Amino acid sequence: MDPLQLLQPLEAEIKGTKLKAHWDSGATITCVPEAFLEDERPIQTMLIKTIHGEKQQDVYYLTFKVQGRKVEAEVLASPYDYILLNPSDVPWLMKKPLQLTVLVPLHEYQERLLQQTALPKEQKELLQKLFLKYDALWQHWENQVGHRRIKPHNIATGTLAPRPQKQYPINPKAKPSIQIVIDDLLKQGVLIQQNSTMNTPVYPVPKPDGKWRMVLDYREVNKTIPLIAAQNQHSAGILSSIYRGKYKTTLDLTNGFWAHPITPESYWLTAFTWQGKQYCWTRLPQGFLNSPALFTADVVDLLKEIPNVQAYVDDIYISHDDPQEHLEQLEKIFSILLNAGYVVSLKKSEIAQREVEFLGFNITKEGRGLTDTFKQKLLNITPPKDLKQLQSILGLLNFARNFIPNYSELVKPLYTIVANANGKFISWTEDNSNQLQHIISVLNQADNLEERNPETRLIIKVNSSPSAGYIRYYNEGSKRPIMYVNYIFSKAEAKFTQTEKLLTTMHKGLIKAMDLAMGQEILVYSPIVSMTKIQRTPLPERKALPVRWITWMTYLEDPRIQFHYDKSLPELQQIPNVTEDVIAKTKHPSEFAMVFYTDGSAIKHPDVNKSHSAGMGIAQVQFIPEYKIVHQWSIPLGDHTAQLAEIAAVEFACKKALKISGPVLIVTDSFYVAESANKELPYWKSNGFLNNKKKPLRHVSKWKSIAECLQLKPDIIIMHEKGHQQPMTTLHTEGNNLADKLATQGSYVVHCNTTPSLDAELDQLLQGHYPPGYPKQYKYTLEENKLIVERPNGIRIVPPKADREKIISTAHNIAHTGRDATFLKVSSKYWWPNLRKDVVKSIRQCKQCLVTNATNLTSPPILRPVKPLKPFDKFYIDYIGPLPPSNGYLHVLVVVDSMTGFVWLYPTKAPSTSATVKALNMLTSIAIPKVLHSDQGAAFTSSTFADWAKEKGIQLEFSTPYHPQSSGKVERKNSDIKRLLTKLLIGRPAKWYDLLPVVQLALNNSYSPSSKYTPHQLLFGVDSNTPFANSDTLDLSREEELSLLQEIRSSLHQPTSPPASSRSWSPSVGQLVQERVARPASLRPRWHKPTAILEVVNPRTVIILDHLGNRRTVSVDNLKLTAYQDNGTSNDSGTMALMEEDESSTSST
């Protein structure tokens, strides 16, 4: 507008009311008639200076029109009936030409777009006119910024303000580029020079054209800013929903974030420092947590009425099939963006073309592909020199991961380099360079992918190799894939069966498919013939955890998913066969120094109280080159399963192989044992011999022994040979059959202790002879083959002795009742001598009651540490902390004299050995203790601390792990110190350093309820100069003080341990005890099965063989004495060891 026209009244409108507006060059804020602001709420107050003075006035945010154009601005109320306009609120009335640093070649960009467009000639001319018509929309200068006329955004920071950050070192090459950006933004009001309590570091990033982009590291600010709920849609979702018409256009909103104003109250958060001056943003900064969401939401809202438009941050995509319609919609978009205050960069835009770049991909009619720009970046990659460069390369490659079927396998060697990096240094070889170039070549040759069609069903094709899974997604009826996914199996998954690997791959594919399906059905094609039959897979054939199988099987019940067998899936190349004993099968037995054939067998035990009778057979054979038997063993194992016998036989052979020089072959007919030894044993050894459920393996001691043997002698080969074959079938048939025969013989060796039948006693009763225990006054008769006794209490049955234990067990097992209830139930029908005694004996052997019932005996009394007779004999030491930082200190070393309880406190910065020695050196200048007692912390168990104590002649003593009671004196002092510090430091916990002397004085002059004296009195014999000091000792001479002090100390000496209870028990070797179950679940046994005490360490500590077969040192507090002590059994392993000793002695003779 001509400047003279600004002197004339302008047409304005507020809330539908027309009035006049005047342009005031001196106004700093727009003023409107106060009648229009009665229903508005002020947003802030402002100090207004006029010729009449200064005055605080409310500021409002109002929307109105000037010359038919919408204006949104901050306003004040005025008594006039017209509007006074602030020139900055209507800059379009009188625009000054924008002058920035670098002018962009706008005309060249427009010519390029006109040449590249696919529009017909007539529409090209219309496009040229649009360029001229909307000249104000295009970016004319680098760093040019729009001005979005909306209510300013307020940046909320939550309850905690961010901390100012130091500036990073800046590359000198970046400074000229950054200075130009700052100067241009200052001219446009995007930046202002303003001091702030906050500071954010500037982080220049190089651009491909050699210039530098100004980026600010707002991570510290973003930590304190609440994330708004509205977030941008994922780019994959946008790409799958865009319209792919004949004509496509992409527009780039340059510096879009900087067009959005923020409130003045938010300026301080955005501050940064450049060249010694601090600047703040008046617009939405890049790098701010919520900037993308706020900006995208505004653009989407502006263009919501335009069809076939998608916006993602500052990129806008529009497509139509008709060229005229496409131009008409483009003009609408240009008009909306211009009125909104945005600026469009034609340099990065593409208008009405058949193929365009959007969100990093080349968008075509059918789908998406890698752009030429991206492919050129790949070709420009050079071998990395450090870890950061390698991570940058992997990040670039990862963008195209879905374009090739085996991406994860190709990049796995490069990720291995990252995992093995030593700091920023990497080990890069020529093979790695070749691998990188191969990946780049494969990606540059990758075909385009099809976009997801939401109108069709989703197809998934799944296959797997021993090390990886392969997934491809298709639209139904299409041959071009939507995407590829390649999944590398983890260490646990690599042990799965081939079917389980397919199910794992299928699971990974279906997780992604749920997003891609868009409500349509999912059809899964795989090499699995029948998914329903998989449910019946036997448990021994499953390697995966049950929870995985539950997850896999839930897909069968999902109505959205259908499973199909596809035998046409391409065969995967280079898939190795199932691992077998290749080494053993390719070598002749004569090439081994010795061959052992092993087998195990078990039969039903003739004793009804036992399940099995197991035995193992081992044949030591040598091929020289004929088959020759060197030695053979047939060993009974007792009540064990055939599986244990198979494992024990291999273990026996492994131990024998250790004595033989040269390679040894061990042959077993157990597929489980051979597979476990060759495949599973290394995994078990690495994870502590746990199964897939993270529980200890069965027969863990045997497997540990086999693992040790294989480690000591790596040339032991264990192979599987099918058993029970016809003679001369293979080289190993004869040896295998011999081992089977020896094992069967061993299983039939049963040790039975027979007792004479008592039926003869019953016959004697019927004949008038009375064995001991049968009263003569009772009448004994035979009725229906049962012996009946008539007693004063009634008629009862006298059962044979062989049936009595079964009768008691049946009565007891109904409800696992106690001895009295069980006795009453049995005696209601039966009688025999010593019935109550037999009931008690039987109940004491009930396994369920043993592991569930509480003990009725107490453990021995707690051993008290021997209390020293003199001060300085023994010190207890420990650390308190970490505490809140105070004067740079975090911990306190507490030293307590054992006899007196006197405390010394030393603040330290860390619980280290050097800090401990430094503090104790100060203390030992007074006196050197004989003993130092501590826990097993690193500060007290180091070699440095041990050397220091040895030099001082101090004996070190440590408490039992996880048993703080053994350091009770210092632990109680720690509690007192923390409690006293808490009370003294309410509201100021970081001031504890200054109060340590006060705390030490208070503790040393506090009376002990047990001794009735203070630690200061016990150490020095007199009170300190504190309030409530004892005045009775003030008139005593020093000799009298010392005599009184010795009398007091003697009276405080206590015995080592209190007297034992009448119901306590003392441990001894051979006693049967039961260990308490740690944290038993509900309705679970509270005690483990009985085991014998192997060694008594002290009256309260013993060594037992735990339920896993390991020797463990335990406290008697966690044991109960087994009620029945006469049922000890021999150790099977001991029997086996004894047989080996007999054999060795035989061979030596």
From Swiss-Prot:
Binds 2 magnesium ions for reverse transcriptase polymerase activity. One of its GO terms (biological process) is viral penetration into host nucleus. Its EC number is 2.7.7.49, 2.7.7.7, 3.1.26.4, 3.4.23.-. Residues 186-363 form the Reverse transcriptase domain. Specific enzymatic cleavages in vivo by viral protease yield mature proteins. The protease is not cleaved off from Pol. Since cleavage efficiency is not optimal for all sites, long and active p65Pro-RT, p87Pro-RT-RNaseH and even some Pr125Pol are detected in infected cells. Its cofactor is Mg(2+). Residues 1127-1149 are annotated as: Disordered. Residues 867-1023 form the Integrase catalytic domain. GO terms for cellular component: host cell; host cell cytoplasm; host cell nucleus; virion component. The keyword Magnesium applies. The active site is at D24 (for protease activity). Pfam families: Integrase_H2C2, RNase_H, RT_RNaseH_2, rve, RVT_1, SH3_11, Spuma_A9PTase. Residues 1139-1149 have a biased composition (Acidic residues). One of its GO terms (molecular function) is RNA-directed DNA polymerase activity. It catalyses: Endonucleolytic cleavage to 5'-phosphomonoester; DNA(n) + a 2'-deoxyribonucleoside 5'-triphosphate = DNA(n+1) + diphosphate. The record marks F596, Y597, H751, C752 as: Cleavage. PANTHER family: PROTEIN CBG26694, PROTEIN NYNRIN-LIKE. This is Pro-Pol polyprotein. It comes from Simian foamy virus type 1.
